[in-house]
Regions:
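C-terminal cap/loop subdomain of S1 sulfatases and analogous C-terminal strand-loop tails that border
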Residues: 110-116, 122, 142, 153-224, ...
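Short beta-strand segments
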Residues: 5-12, 103-108, 135-136, 193-196
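Histidine-centered active-site microenvironments of extracellular/periplasmic hydrolases
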Residues: 16-22, 26, 91-143, 150-153, ...
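Non-transmembrane alpha-helical segments in soluble domains
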Residues: 24-28, 76-79, 83, 87-94, ...
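Core domains of carbohydrate- and sulfate-ester-processing enzymes
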Residues: 16-63, 272, 281-283
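Active-site rim elements
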Residues: 64-77, 121, 141-152, 164-169, ...
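Active-site regions of oxyanion-processing enzymes, predominantly non-cytosolic
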Residues: 1-39, 94-103, 242
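A long, amphipathic alpha-helix that forms part
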Residues: 60-102
Length: 287
């Protein structure tokens, strides 16, 4: 009779990509398909975007060491491992008395580049880094196997849960309830998804376009109906001026300052190790 909330964080596919061998074996190296990365992909990217991508960093190292296929294999193996762990949680729920009155939300906090646009990790405003899974099961509301193609962002999760659980929603929240989409995935949704990486760097994504604007005003625009890999930057094309203006209205009117950084955090262990140096000449029996 008492409501409960359970948060279950599954660490993979976060680095390091170390999982049992059987998950690597699911993806033989000779079957791995590497991303298609045009040699001149970054030529039409503004300097701010290139700096964020850092093609001379991770991607250059991956190419030099010839580890691209190994990296993709390890990422896929980590996802397969995570999938099994999700299954364990859901199996336990299905076997419990709460299977038919528990809302399930499965989501990942960000995507990941595996060399697309000569970039690795997250840390960008492109599709690969900003698109992530979002799945919801609401007994009596959602239908199994349905898919919603609307672009939404994670600010909407909490307001959605508030409405579903009949809880008061704080007026300070920027997100919107997605209950209408859960009931009807084809429902009209006018608000595009907003992503921020670093202060004053934003991307707005609707069902067709992605508009990126960096802190210095540099822009990128991609038409996903024609260019799903974001290879052609349309930001300087005059015929898309109206599209840019429409999407730019969704950029934040205000930008909160960065959170204060406490330089002392994480220094305790290091300080303790430094203090312990030279106190004993006795060799440790441990490796």
């Amino acid at each position: 009779q008492k409501p409960f909330f359970l948060a279950c964080g599954i660490y993979r596919p976060h680095m390091p990509w170390q999982v049992p061998r059987k998950y690597y074996d699911m993806y033989p190296l000779d079957k791995i398909q590497l991303p298609n990365v045009p040699e001149h992909d970054l030529d039409d990217i503004p300097p701010a975007g290139v700096r964020m991508a850092k093609p001379g960093g991770d991607h250059a190292k991956i190419l030099k060491t010839e580890n691209w296929r190994y990296a993709v294999q390890a990422y896929l193996a980590s996802i397969a491992f995570a999938d099994v762990q999700v299954g364990r949680v859901l199996d336990a729920l299905d076997a419990s008395p709460y299977a038919n009155n528990t809302i399930v939300v499965l989501w990942g906090d960000h995507g990941w580049h595996l060399g697309e646009k000569k970039h690795w990790r997250k840390f960008s405003l492109w599709e690969e880094a900003t698109r992530a899974p979002l799945m919801m099961v609401v007994p009596g509301v959602t239908q199994a196997g349905t898919k919603c193609d609307q672009a939404v962002d994670f600010m909407n999760i909490y307001p959605t849960l508030c409405e579903l659980c009949e809880l008061p929603r704080g007026e300070h929240l920027d997100g919107l309830s997605m209950v209408s989409l859960l009931k009807d995935p084809a429902q009209t949704w006018e608000r595009p998804a907003l992503t921020t990486h670093g202060r004053l760097n934003h991307a707005v994504r609707d069902n067709r376009y992605r508009l990126i604007r960096y802190q210095n005003g540099d822009e990128e625009l991609y038409d996903h109906s024609q260019d799903p890999m974001e290879w052609k930057n349309l930001a300087d094309d005059p015929q898309y001026a109206e599209t840019k203006e429409r999407l730019a209205k969704w950029f934040p009117a205000k930008n909160a300052p960065d959170a204060p950084h406490d330089a002392s955090l994480g220094q305790g262990k290091k300080k303790k190790q430094q203090q312990g140096k030279g106190k004993s000449k006795k060799k440790s029996a441990q490796p």
